[in-house]
Amino acid sequence: MSIKILSESEIKQVANSYQAPAVLFANPKNLYQRRAKRLRDLAQNHPLSDYLLFAADIVESQLSTLEKNPLPPQQLEQLNTIEPLNAKTFKRNSIWREYLTEILDEIKPKANEQIAATIEFLEKASSAELEEMANKLLAQEFNLVSSDKAVFIWAALSLYWLQAAQQIPHNSQVENAENLHHCPVCGSLPVASMVQIGTSQGLRYLHCNLCESEWNLVRAQCTNCNSHDKLEMWSLNEELALVRAETCGSCESYLKMMFQEKDPYVEPVADDLASIFLDIEMEEKGFARSGLNPFIFPAEEA
């Protein structure tokens, strides 16, 4: 990995020099509030309004759980500086299962018949069964867990990882410009990338689908294979073009890119989900998605 999380001593060494941060860490409460509002706004007159509103309910349940049951201080001193919270190797606290229970309790009164059946299954699942499904998802074996269950399990895991990321040093530096297609904090996939405004004006940051951190990657470079060639931008509405798909002819993948200058309220997860018809268009052109939205998991293999 090419981005290193700095130790306390290293932070002091670079304290007097300013450079754009390699990693941006989320403000959990603000993130959930903005995402839920954006999902509800995008749901208006949208063909998939019911699912966007369901996603908003999940996000609001994450916020409620965060406020009622915050993650206690963890023993994180001996972590690696490269992917310190690696999703596949980091020993997670079982509190994530409490988060799952609380999220399910919040959603249950609003659930339709199909969602209620999923909730009932997860409520009856043993701790070992839940941990096994979590292990598969964190290992990116998404096809081994049904998508209806994955959404809830991932919501709980993400709430845990987001809070754990608040407890590690928040300074970082780029070691080199290679291998930036995974999150430098937890090693997970991006949802999409965002071209920012404000102090990071014009810089592109990829948004992690697990710990919600963002990391800088130069524009005009494939987010999957690092190629600078055969890159194209696509959109369904060229006039607005708030959300575009960047395709790479070298690896035949794509990832969406969003532009805060066109709408400061754009939100990676919400706007990615709401632009699912752009995904369909890209797949019809033969490109495979290189990222993952926490509300769109692949179908389980039979």
From Swiss-Prot:
Transmembrane segments: none annotated. Its main location: cytoplasm. GO terms for biological process: protein maturation. It holds the Pfam family FdhE_N. InterPro entries: FdhE-like_sf (IPR024064), FdhE_C (IPR056796), FdhE_central (IPR056797), FdhE_N (IPR056774), Formate_DH_accessory (IPR006452). One of its GO terms (molecular function) is ferric iron binding. This is Protein FdhE homolog. The lineage of its organism: Bacteria, Pseudomonadati, Pseudomonadota, Gammaproteobacteria, Pasteurellales. The gene is fdhE.
